[in-house]
Structure formats: structure tokens, C-alpha cells
């Protein structure tokens, strides 16, 4: 426990202050002439997405700083080439060979000047750091790689090796049909091995996760904690020069403050507006609104390691008390679907017969009484910031608190702030946790294993602390086949186990929302996370009629 907490605090401390030396400058100075302002709620604990479980680096920044071997088409949900031009699946899914794109330059920054283009050394370095526990880089800034740890990545990847300068091969201990999809997530962003070697010589390895260097369309120019992040155009970006010279990511306001900035023009783009703000956004002719299905789920996690919540009957009784339809109306305002599974309805493995629970407070009260739990008090831990899957976590908690009171259960709401949330959850004092998950993968495994596998307890993404060897076995069966029908059958079984055991109660799968000023063009809103800003531009005033 001490080691886990220490690792979390080390990572949190990486960017707690100013990330790079920069002169004091107003974040929005002359931005309309050379870029745009992207307003978002969040904070930065690391600039390396593989070291994060979620947050701003994964949702927004990774697509600007870095590239991955593969991408996911935001419209067809198919895998696409990115740094890998092509790939081969060998040995029934136990070997994956990637043929890399040539002439992909890394960013030239104030802290690093590359002397070569991206090659196989960079891919090997990136993934050896993650899976090889003996690699000298594995423990830099803590040994945790939350997403990959939850997948037991280090246990299944036997090797990643360079076949030549532009060919890389991964060998797995067991076939894994989801492997390509995990490499298409932002957690699998490719780092510069040359930059890492430079930092090694200077004995400054920790800077790799603090001062990023990637191949993406924008690079870090300035960072002021809790205020803003300034991104500068990567002029040599391999897809072509991004259209905007700079982007300011504004971190300085909460929900209503960000809306005010959008209305006054201080913000050009508002990420994840609250559903309650939709009528304002729709009625203002100066604004545009984009809605897309989201690969996400909001859920209530029961701490199954703590009595009486270790009893599935208790979890089912409590679930009956929650009025999910009221959550849809009061929190999401029609921008979400009631979740009947951990998987969103857009997933190819979603079970159309799935039904986890119902709203029946009388039955809940009766079952709790029969279990001898008539005066139960529970602590509900809640993040304070809006999330992609839940625009108003605290209000959601208050509604759940009121529902529980109707069946005689007292719920004490404990707001949990920012970077210490995971560390505090590991001390096991909570009973319930309001959380969620969003993925940039269309593979069901990106929901099941990170949230509910036994390994995910140690990676701090399994907030229910639930471990079922039978469930893990079903997930392994799903990964062992390249046949879609066999995988769907296994995931149906997994969803059936979850409906019986109920370690978490899925609440909603929400739409992804984005509001922006009328003159901003080229934004792409993906179901899987934020897309690159490379194609964003501001239409000139003489070319657009102002509303």
C-alpha cells in the first residue's frame, strides 16, 4: 500500500508546478489571430498517457502530442494505420508484426532536438518500458501503467523486438484478439527513444513524463498549473502542417465559468458542456453543438471487499433503491441512455437481452430488512469535477443519497478531489464509489478487464475490489479466439456473471458533447476520445456571415 501511494504521489508531483520555463504571458493574447482556445475541466498529473488511468492527458492532450501505431476511424469504428502503415497477425493471434511509416519526424522543442526520424527503436523503447519490469525505465516516476497493468500486459507480452529499422514484432504468451485495439488507444502513444537516451546521460529520466516529445501535430509550449496549457504547432508534422499555429487549453474555470467564457468569446470550444446547459447552447446563434454516441459508462461501484457489500444479495437490494430514470432526466437531460450492461449499446458485444436491475424501493426495503440491514450507513465517494460520462457527479450522488434514504439507508457523501482520488480509494474506507469509464477502443475487452479483472485491483482501476476467477477465465476465453461469434458468446457469459454478482451498477452511457463558436471549423468529435486539432481552423470574418 505504501509503495502504491508513493508512486501515485510521485506522478502527481511531476506537473504540480510549471512544466517548463516560460515567460509570463496572457493565455489568450492575440489568440484569434493565430489559434483558438479550448476550455475543458481537468488537471494534469503526467504528460505521458501510459502513466495515467484517465484525465486530461488521455482525453485531450495525447492526440496532440503523440501518435500510436494504429488509430480508430471515428465513423466506421475500424482500425486504421497511423505510425504503422500495415500489420500482420500471425500464430493465431500470438504474434503481431508492424511495418512502420517512414519519414515521421519528432517534435523539436526547447528541451530536445531530434537527429533522426521515428523508427523501430522508439516503438521497442515505448513498450519495453511498460512490460519489462527489469527495464531501467520501468520504475521511472513509479512502476504503474494503470491501463496496461489492468490488462496484465506485462505477463502476456513475451517480447517486442526490432526486425529492422521499420519493422517491429510483438510475441505474446497467449493469443489475444483484442491486442490491436489496445495498441490503438492513447495509452499506447509512442515515445522518443533518442530523447530518453539523452535524459539518461543527464540523469534526468523523470523529465520524459514532464516535458513531452512526440510525433503529433502540436507540442508543449507553456504550462501553468490550474490555469492553461499552450500548444505550439509542430511544423514538420508528418500529415502536413496543422492549420492553427497555436492552441490554448484553458483549465481555469468550472462548469458555469466555462460556459460564460464561451458566450463572451473567451473560449472558442467548450468540451463536455453540462447537459443542463444544452438549451442555452442551442438557442444562441453564435454557437454550434456536436453530439456523438460515446464509448463510456457511468457506474456505482460497491466495495465488495468490505462487509456487508461483499454479499451480492446486499448489492442487489441497494440497486433496487436507485431511480435511474430520474438520473436520466435530472443529470443527463436526454443526452444518455440507461445502462443495462457495462458495455454501451454501440459495442458489438452488447447483449440486447441484458437487464441488470429495476427500480423497486419497496422490494429494496423488504430485502434489506430480511438481511438485517435496517439502519445501514454507507460512505459514497464522489469526484468533484464533471466527467465525460457524468456531467454532474455531486448532483448524481445527492439523488442517490435521497433514493437510499427512502429505503432506510443513510448515505454520507465524501467529495474526492483530483489526483489523490485513486490513492484514497486504495485505503478501502469507502463503501460506494461513483465513477465511470471511457475508452478509445471498440473492443469489449477495454471495458471488462480494466474495470473488473482481478489484475485491475492492483492497477487501481477496479474500484469495486472484486475478483472472480471464473469471470477472468471467461475473459481469457474471449481473447483466445479470432472468431467474432465465439467472442460474443464469451462476452454474453461475462455480462451474465456481472448481472448475478453486481460488483458495479451501470447507470448511464452518455453522448459526447462539444460546443464551439460559429467561426471554428474542422473539429472532429470521436466516440473514443478527443481527436487531433490539426485540421481545426477559424473561418475568416469576410468569409462567414456573423449570426
Curated annotation (Swiss-Prot):
Q: Which Gene3D superfamilies match?
A: Dipeptide-binding Protein, Domain 1, Dipeptide-binding Protein, Domain 3, Periplasmic binding protein-like II
**What are the annotated GO cellular component locations?**
ATP-binding cassette (ABC) transporter complex, substrate-binding subunit-containing; membrane; outer membrane-bounded periplasmic space
What keyword terms does UniProt attach to this protein?
A: Periplasm, Signal, Transport
Q: Which InterPro entries match?
A: Peptide/Ni-bd, SBP_5, SBP_5_CS, SBP_5_dom
Q: Which Pfam families match?
A: SBP_bac_5
What start and end residues bound the annotated signal peptide? 1-21
Localization terms from the record:
Periplasm
NCBIfam families named in the record: PRK15109.1
Record's function text: Not part of a putrescine export system. Very similar to a S.typhimurium protein implicated in antimicrobial peptide resistance, but the SapBCDF operon in E.coli is implicated in putrescine export.
Family note? Belongs to the bacterial solute-binding protein 5 family.
List the protein's name. Answer: Probable ABC transporter periplasmic-binding protein SapA
Q: Identify the species of origin.
A: Escherichia coli (strain K12)
Q: What is the lineage of its organism?
A: Bacteria, Pseudomonadati, Pseudomonadota, Gammaproteobacteria, Enterobacterales
> Which gene is transcribed and translated to give this protein?
sapA
Amino acid at each position: 500500500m505504501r509503495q502504491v501511494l508513493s508512486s501515485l504521489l510521485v506522478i502527481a508531483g511531476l506537473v504540480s508546478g510549471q512544466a517548463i520555463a516560460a515567460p509570463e504571458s496572457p493565455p489568450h493574447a492575440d489568440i484569434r489571430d493565430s489559434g483558438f482556445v479550448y476550455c475543458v475541466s481537468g488537471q494534469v498529473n503526467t504528460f505521458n498517457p501510459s502513466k495515467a488511468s484517465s484525465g486530461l492527458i488521455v482525453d485531450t492532450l495525447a492526440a496532440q502530442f503523440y501518435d500510436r501505431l494504429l488509430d480508430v476511424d471515428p465513423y466506421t469504428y475500424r482500425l486504421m494505420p497511423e505510425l504503422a502503415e500495415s500489420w500482420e497477425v500471425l500464430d493465431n493471434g500470438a504474434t503481431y508484426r508492424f511495418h512502420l511509416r517512414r519519414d515521421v519526424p519528432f517534435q523539436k522543442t526547447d528541451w530536445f532536438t531530434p537527429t533522426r526520424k521515428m523508427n523501430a527503436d522508439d516503438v521497442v523503447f515505448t513498450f519495453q518500458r511498460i512490460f519489462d519490469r527489469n527495464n531501467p525505465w520501468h520504475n521511472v516516476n513509479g512502476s504503474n501503467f494503470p491501463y496496461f497493468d489492468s490488462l496484465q500486459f506485462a505477463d502476456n507480452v513475451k517480447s517486442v523486438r526490432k526486425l529492422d529499422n521499420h519493422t517491429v514484432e510483438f510475441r505474446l504468451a497467449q493469443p489475444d484478439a483484442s491486442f490491436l485495439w489496445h495498441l490503438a488507444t492513447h495509452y499506447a502513444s509512442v515515445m522518443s527513444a533518442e530523447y530518453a537516451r539523452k535524459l539518461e546521460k543527464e540523469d534526468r529520466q523523470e523529465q520524459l513524463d514532464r516535458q513531452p516529445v512526440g510525433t503529433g501535430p502540436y507540442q508543449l509550449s507553456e504550462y501553468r498549473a490550474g490555469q492553461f496549457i499552450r500548444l505550439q504547432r509542430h511544423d514538420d508534422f508528418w500529415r502536413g502542417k496543422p492549420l492553427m499555429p497555436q492552441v490554448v487549453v484553458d483549465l481555469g474555470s468550472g462548469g458555469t465559468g466555462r460556459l460564460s467564457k464561451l458566450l463572451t468569446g473567451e473560449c472558442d470550444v467548450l468540451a463536455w458542456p453540462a447537459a443542463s446547459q444544452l438549451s442555452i447552447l442551442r438557442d444562441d446563434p453564435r454557437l454550434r453543438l456536436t453530439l456523438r454516441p460515446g464509448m463510456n459508462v457511468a457506474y456505482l461501484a460497491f466495495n465488495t471487499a468490505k462487509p456487508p457489500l461483499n454479499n451480492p444479495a446486499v448489492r442487489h437490494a441497494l440497486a433496487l433503491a436507485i431511480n435511474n430514470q430520474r438520473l436520466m432526466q435530472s443529470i443527463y437531460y436526454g443526452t444518455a441512455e440507461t445502462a443495462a450492461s457495462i458495455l454501451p449499446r454501440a459495442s458489438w458485444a452488447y447483449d440486447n437481452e441484458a437487464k441488470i436491475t429495476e427500480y423497486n424501493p419497496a422490494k429494496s426495503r423488504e430485502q434489506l430488512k430480511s438481511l438485517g440491514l435496517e439502519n445501514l450507513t454507507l460512505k459514497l465517494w464522489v469526484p468533484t469535477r464533471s466527467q465525460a460520462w457524468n456531467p454532474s457527479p455531486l448532483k448524481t450522488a445527492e439523488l442517490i443519497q435521497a433514493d437510499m434514504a427512502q429505503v432506510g439507508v443513510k448515505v454520507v457523501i465524501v467529495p474526492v478531489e483530483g489526483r489523490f482520488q485513486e490513492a484514497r480509494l486504495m485505503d478501502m474506507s469507502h463503501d460506494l464509489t461513483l465513477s465511470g469509464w471511457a475508452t478509445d477502443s471498440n473492443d469489449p475487452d477495454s471495458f471488462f478487464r480494466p474495470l473488473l479483472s482481478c489484475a485491475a485491483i492492483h492497477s487501481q482501476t477496479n474500484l469495486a475490489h472484486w475478483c472472480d476467477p471464473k469471470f477472468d477465465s471467461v475473459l481469457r476465453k474471449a481473447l483466445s479466439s479470432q472468431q467474432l461469434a465465439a467472442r460474443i458468446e464469451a462476452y454474453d457469459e461475462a455480462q451474465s456473471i456481472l448481472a448475478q454478482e453486481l460488483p458495479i451498477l451501470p447507470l448511464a452511457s452518455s453522448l459526447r458533447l462539444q460546443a464551439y463558436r460559429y467561426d471554428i471549423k474542422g473539429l472532429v468529435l470521436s466516440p473514443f476520445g478527443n481527436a487531433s486539432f490539426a485540421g481545426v481552423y477559424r473561418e475568416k470574418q469576410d468569409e462567414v456571415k456573423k449570426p
